[in-house]
Amino acid sequence: MVRYITTLERLGKDVTWLILQQARGIPEAKVIDDFMVDRTIVQMFAKADLSERLCITAAVRQMSGHCVYFAPEDKWEGAIERFPMQLLGAGSYYMDGMFVHGVPVRSWVPENEVTFPVINCGSPDAHPAHVIADIICMLNLSHDDLRNVQVAWVGSPSGALHSLVTATRYFPFRLSIAIPPI
């Protein structure tokens, strides 16, 4: 299984569909699972985002796991840029996975650098986890038939918008976009 979820493009249609199907099987938010007992996830946020942080923490706790949070003020981003192999290697001893937020995917791709899962949970150029959750909602509301689903994006461009555009290549929903002049 893919260990790095950075963009839908890198995952491709088949793997994106597989992850989506697996995510649909995740229990409701109030159900406690033991999938992550004695496992620790590190959240590395280059930009503060309380809603994303709480969402990830709740999901990991639901699966009986633990979270460690590195905030923007911890200055971790510069250290990883200068010493990626040393820090990520040492980190892999202490952690079982990593969520990265606020770092453009094109500037740091973890593939072949780490042995644990790395998930992009929101960057300026992609937000695959958010879009997979959106598509699950669309599937549930459309009774698994996305052909008649019309999605409207109204607002500023973001990683979620970029991932939605990519998702239209893999899934048969329509997307209308309205963004302010740049």
Question: Language-model features: where?
Answer:
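Surface-exposed alpha-helical segments enriched in charged/polar residues
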Residues: R24, L88-G89, T166
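Fold-independent oxyanion-binding glycine-rich loops
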Residues: L8, Q22-A23, M44-K47, H101-V103, ...
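Phosphate/diphosphate ligand-binding glycine-rich loop within oxidoreductases
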Residues: D34-L139
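Glycine-rich phosphate/diphosphate-binding loop of Rossmann-like nucleotide-binding domains
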Residues: A46-A58, S64, L139-I182
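Positively charged, low-complexity intrinsically disordered leader regions
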Residues: M1-L54, A126
